[in-house]
Amino acid sequence: GIMTPFHPNTLGVPGRIVTPKDETPGAKLRAEGYDMELVTGRPPAPHFHSWTHYFWQSQEMWPDLYAQIHPDKAASLSLEDGDRVIVKTSHGSIEARAWITPGIRKGAVFVPIGWGEKQPYHPWRSVNFMTDKTQRDPISEQTNLKTLLCRVTKA
């Protein structure tokens, strides 16, 4: 769907308008302390999902799964660059290294895809296990991979 500029809470599709069923689907989770948005995606090149994460060059550059966190949020959590953190959603959790960077929004945490639990060098639980398979876009049926509510704590 396409976001409509005049009705920001609706997605427009030729011939129909889809309105979210619940205007505040995350209110309950926010009340439970899930105050950050988990964004997942591809890490920077040359690491490309399972094709390259076994290469020694990628292992040198990114030996561990990381979570990018804004410096202001990191300070409020008493985190320093390189600390081990737990990123938790209502569906699971992972452990990663904190990468403190001003290149991310204050209320977000970025965790890359492509690290799996069967890696020979640094086994981690995949971030995909943390997604809510029931929370789907009403038009495309795509699962929510970009704004899943989470909380971050020091491991």
Predicted regions: what they are:
Residues G1-Q57:
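Long, low-complexity segments enriched in small/aliphatic residues
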Residues H49, Y54-Q68, D72-A155:
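Long, contiguous, secondary-structure-rich segments that constitute the structural scaffold
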